[in-house]
Amino acid sequence: MYRLQIEKIRGFRDFYPEDMDVEKFIFKTAEEAAEAFGFRRIDFPSLEYLDLYRIKSGEELLQQTYSFVDKGGREVTLIPEATPSTVRMVTSRKDLQRPLRWYSFPKVWRYEEPQAGRYREHYQFNADIFGSDSPEADAEVIALASSILDRLGLQDIYEIRINSRKIMEEIIGGMTSSDPFSVFSIIDRYHKISREEFVDQLRSAGIGEDGVSMIADLCSGTRGIDEMARITGKSSEEIARMAAVEDLLASYGVKNVRYDFSIVRGLSYYTGIVFEAYDRSGQFRAILGGGRYDNLASLMSGESVPAVGFGMGDAVISLLLKRENVQIPREKKSVYICRVGKINSSIMNEYSRKLRERGMNVTVEIMERGLSAQLKYASAIGADFAVIFGERDLERGVVTIRNMYTGSQENVGLDSVVEHLISQAT
């Protein structure tokens, strides 16, 4: 008989229970950090009009969309990122009190080459502040990003790297009459291509030899923000603003900040500060990234709404947690209720209900199998305790409680089972 073999689509993931434990940890940690900063959660459709991304996302992103014409003849797409949808929501309501601090955790889709930490479908945490053009807003979103990584147990493996689109426009504007974004697109690929390719692409964009040498040198390493005026030969308001952001970040306790000219971010709507959390080991370049985008709302609605935010994908974070051997905490203690002999299921269900009411997770044996098989299963699902209801023990009014980690066990009276487990779980 022919059997249809259907495999998972390339670039997409299945999440088994142990995978979802990691995802839940990432979601919960990011959400708790965001709400500690006063951010509130939003959500939006997974499907948007394609025109939403034609406004200012850039040609490369448009080519990566999962877009199609629906049955109503409309050009739509699975969302490739969250920012345009979030801005659409901001501009759709005039009664919202600003500044708005919003976060979201949608799935996003991009048709790009899968690789470690990069898939065609992933969850992306996003946090944005709308309605403030201050350095304080810039620093706050970076501090939130840093707080999330620290809470995840990744505090020693990253540094914050920042740049400014305005400063880069000042530098590049004097080198070419071409659209600066075409040069930004090349700089964004600096770490993905050889130096020879990088230099050739800059020349093709109309940059002269002196400019090519300067850009290549600027992108070759990180610097302190206090070096900016000397390096650029400028003393602009934007350089002063970047220094102010650094000082504000220090007051948040974020001190691992470096200036990196190669950080420009690939999307065309950024207007000021841009930043990434950089993996110090070099295995993954950008752990998260974002920046200021003050003009996107006006392109959609004509209303000017300054904004700054960042996005963080789950895939790289999950790989970093594994690499750094971060132990995923268990939210609740769990119990597996076993049966030996002819045991009425009602008594097992009664005690499972009592334990659940006290906040424990309880799984009840529903198969007819030996005790060793039950204990093996309890271990496989990560139960902390096994409560063994034995036919003979019940005649004496006791059950056996086994600690699944130490292997120790003891007999406990039926009237003390719940309190005993609660005391052991705390």
Swiss-Prot record:
Keyword vocabulary terms for this entry: Aminoacyl-tRNA synthetase, ATP-binding, Cytoplasm, Ligase, Nucleotide-binding, Protein biosynthesis
Tagged with keyword Heme: no
One example of a Gene Ontology biological process annotation: histidyl-tRNA aminoacylation
Subcellular locations according to the entry: Cytoplasm
Catalytic activity: tRNA(His) + L-histidine + ATP = L-histidyl-tRNA(His) + AMP + diphosphate + H(+)
InterPro entries given in the database record: aa-tRNA-synth_II (IPR006195), aa-tRNA-synth_II/BPL/LPL (IPR045864), Anticodon-bd (IPR004154), Anticodon-bd_dom_sf (IPR036621), His-tRNA-ligase (IPR015807), HisRS-like_core (IPR041715), HisRS/HisZ (IPR004516), HisRS_anticodon (IPR033656)
GO cellular component, one term: cytoplasm
PROSITE patterns according to UniProt: AA_TRNA_LIGASE_II
Enzyme Commission (EC) number: 6.1.1.21
Matching NCBIfam families: hisS
PANTHER family in alphabetical order: HISTIDINE--TRNA LIGASE, MITOCHONDRIAL-RELATED (PTHR43707:SF1), HISTIDYL-TRNA SYNTHETASE (PTHR43707)
Protein name as annotated: Histidine--tRNA ligase
The gene coding this protein: hisS
